[in-house]
Amino acid sequence: MHAMKLTAPGGLDQIHLAEIEPREPGFGEIQVEIKATSLNFHDYAVVTGLIPADDGRIPMSDGAGVVTAVGEGVTTLAEGDRVLSYFFPNWAGGRPTLPDLLGVPGDHIDGFAAQTVTMPATAFSRMPANLDFEAASTLSCAGLTAWRALVVETALKPGDWVLVQGSGGVSVVALQMARMMGCRVIATSSSDAKLERLGALGAEHLINYKNHANWGEQAFELTGGAGVDLVVEVGGPGNLPQSISALAVDGCISLIGVLTGWAGEVPTAALMTKNGRLSGITVGSQADQANMIAAVEAHDMQPVIDKTYPLAELTDAFRYQESQQHFGKICVSL
């Protein structure tokens, strides 16, 4: 079968098509024919060497497919079931511990850039019944990250204000989920064309941050001076001064991305004045994923997919991601 492998120390020119032998499932394991995967910044960081990975690692943390064989002792899944991977296969629920955050596919272990995988049955949930494989594959990292920020960590209510930044996978699905919850959304982007699309998805106010350097202050004013209850922070340290300006008293900034840099200064006095919280978010638990899937099914939410590439063109998919031209998610079909 075909798989894409990464030659250490990484780089987009170090992703190669390889032939590997599928492995029969052992006790507690299932074999899954992977139908689709989707790109996340985490995957980009792995393949470019920002996150070191073993030589020969099969990348990609998201996977959706069909169970083709079941090992002894498996009772939760059966042959023919449509399944979706967990980003953290060891994190069942509750607050995370360090061991919960280990074993990430495509990083700590081989991932889903392969036509067939054999893994513990506990590495998969059922797929949303209303989605195809490509759409489902967008949820296990980006979708669950947005869900945890909006629902698990913040417990937003209808009418609350949410600020989303840009038009990447997490930001777009966060906008969709926020509107699904009855929240009001302010969206920022450097592209008027993308802002128009964000508006069509339900963003109430649109800010081109290239034209408005003090976009946080503008967002604060657009709420009538109340401020936003949640900032879905994908930019990281370079954005924090404006994100804090946008924040309501007792609001939360969910830090889920570091596009402006891995480290930087935090205007702590401004955050304290707002009685605000800066909360790091890395995806979510298996219990969170079950709740997210139930909501996606109940509301028939359809993730936004920009482009889909074949497996052999995974490098091209990453180059397109690198160009930042995409709106929503980039998928790979196997």
Model-derived regions: residue spans:
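C-terminal capping/lid region of NAD(P)-dependent oxidoreductase domains
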Residues: 225, 300-304, 316-334
